[in-house]
């Protein structure tokens, strides 16, 4: 299945390269004198991007043909990798579990990156090349973050994600508030990096080693486990983000361009989730600090009630992503394998759902010249195709059966009820009753009702390309929801 996804994404990249060349040639965005120089830059940028994806594909194919055999020795299991003729002990099992999360996330990351690049086709050549270069830096840093065994290299790769993210938000800024949002994101992320530095230095002083595989053999006391866990949660929680550190995220979404909003919610936030997951898995922490659940519950309550009075569509979607990230963090910090499965489905569904939501917000804003809920209504009369796309996306957010988002919700409440019955009932009211009600209430005002635009010139409905895009992402979510069991094999 993953091979087909890679094949599809590779052809999309080739098609985008061809489309860019034709666009530059026929629209005359560059002078004839410098055409070869600009085409060379574009060719090198595209080829570099495709080459790195090809190397990733080869790495996956190499792992796919590695036959892993389980042998029972003295009531314990030993793994034998027949391709490399290696004996993998039980300590390496946690690193193999990380690959279960890593590879599907890489495919989702590549898909969202391609969508962002297609969205940038409306920009000029320099902005397109700049955005592709930053995407390549993020891809290299993210790939290093996934598969490195060094604690130091892991930290540098995680911090390298901030530099292109800041420049994307700063260079594509159109207003002064966007520049302020870029600096706010930068300083909040560096605040979280301080806790990561303290945590990694503390681990290095204790273990005298910077390798994840060697650190996993060290025994941490209860105090050390809780201290490391709190530092990791604050360090990665700033970028997840969780309460009370998520103030920068809605501001960044509102002021940023749509391509960065897609990239931020679908890719960059997930790197923080994956970094926290890798540290907890590979260091094999079993935290006993249960007081983190009240903080995450407060974050869910705060974000849900902020959904009620939002009048900006982008900020509404941003706060809905905050609710889901708190939900995702609860699954991770629980340490239960069943809830880890729920977080796996939630990670993929959140990336696709938030991407589709921000694209729909941009489609509405381009047609009505505003994102304010109070000024938009009657979408079902004026743009029937856009109305159907918004309605389908909203139903998926409400947990309509069949999608992978519904699967993640079902798994979460099924297993979380056994751990904390009262807390699960409390969260059920907010995540299934109040949150979706506030979210759907705002979209109801947009989709239905009489509009003042009816007396004026009607806006254009969705184009064929937009229709395929807005229906393709929900189709992918339903396909993953039906075949979700194949994702965890």
Name these PLM-found stretches.
Residues 354-357, 426-456:
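Predominantly late transmembrane helices and immediately cytosolic-facing juxtamembrane segments
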Residues 383, 440-489:
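Cytoplasmic/organellar membrane-interface segments at the starts of transmembrane helices
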């Amino acid at each position: 299945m993953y091979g087909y996804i890679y094949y599809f994404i590779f052809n999309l990249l080739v098609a985008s390269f061809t489309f860019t060349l034709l666009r530059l040639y026929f629209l005359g965005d560059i002078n004839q004198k410098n055409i070869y120089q600009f085409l060379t830059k574009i060719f090198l940028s595209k080829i570099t991007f495709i080459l790195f994806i090809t190397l990733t594909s080869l790495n996956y194919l190499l792992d796919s043909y590695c036959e892993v055999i389980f042998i029972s020795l003295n009531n314990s299991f030993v793994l034998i990798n027949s391709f490399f003729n290696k004996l993998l002990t039980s300590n390496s099992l946690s690193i193999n579990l990380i690959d279960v999360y890593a590879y599907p996330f890489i495919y989702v990351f590549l898909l969202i990156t391609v969508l962002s690049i297609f969205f940038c086709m409306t920009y000029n050549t320099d902005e397109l090349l700049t955005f592709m270069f930053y995407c390549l830096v993020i891809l290299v840093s993210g790939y290093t973050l996934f598969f490195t065994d060094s604690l130091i290299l892991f930290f540098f790769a995680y911090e390298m994600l901030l530099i292109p993210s800041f420049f994307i938000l700063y260079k594509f800024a159109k207003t002064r508030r966007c520049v302020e949002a870029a600096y706010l994101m930068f300083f909040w992320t560096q605040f979280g990096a301080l806790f990561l530095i303290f945590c990694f230095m503390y681990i290095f002083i204790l273990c005298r080693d910077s390798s994840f595989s060697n650190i996993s053999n060290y025994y941490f006391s209860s105090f050390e486990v809780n201290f490391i866990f709190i530092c990791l949660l604050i360090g990665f929680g700033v970028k997840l983000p969780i309460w009370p550190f998520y103030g920068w995220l809605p501001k960044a979404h509102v002021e940023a361009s749509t391509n960065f909003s897609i990239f931020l919610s679908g890719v960059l936030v997930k790197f923080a989730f994956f970094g926290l997951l890798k540290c907890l898995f590979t260091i094999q922490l079993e935290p006993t600090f249960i007081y983190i659940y009240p903080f995450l519950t407060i974050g869910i309550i705060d974000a849900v009630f902020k959904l009620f009075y939002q009048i900006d569509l982008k900020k509404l979607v941003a706060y809905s992503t905050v609710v889901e990230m708190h939900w995702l963090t609860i699954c991770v910090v629980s340490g239960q394998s069943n809830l880890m499965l729920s977080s796996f489905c939630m990670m993929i569904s959140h990336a696709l759902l938030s991407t589709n939501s921000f694209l729909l917000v941009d489609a509405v804003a381009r047609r009505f010249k505003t994102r304010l809920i109070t000024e938009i209504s009657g979408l079902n009369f004026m743009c029937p195709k856009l109305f159907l796309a918004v309605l389908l996306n909203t139903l998926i957010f409400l947990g309509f059966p069949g999608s992978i988002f519904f699967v993640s919700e079902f798994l979460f409440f099924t297993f979380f009820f056994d751990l904390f019955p009262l807390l699960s009932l409390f969260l059920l009211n907010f995540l299934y009753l109040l949150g979706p009600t506030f979210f759907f209430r705002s979209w109801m005002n947009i989709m239905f009702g009489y509009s003042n635009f009816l007396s004026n010139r009607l806006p254009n409905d969705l184009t064929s390309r937009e229709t395929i895009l807005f229906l393709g992402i929900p189709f992918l979510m339903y396909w993953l929801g039906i075949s979700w069991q194949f994702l965890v094999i």
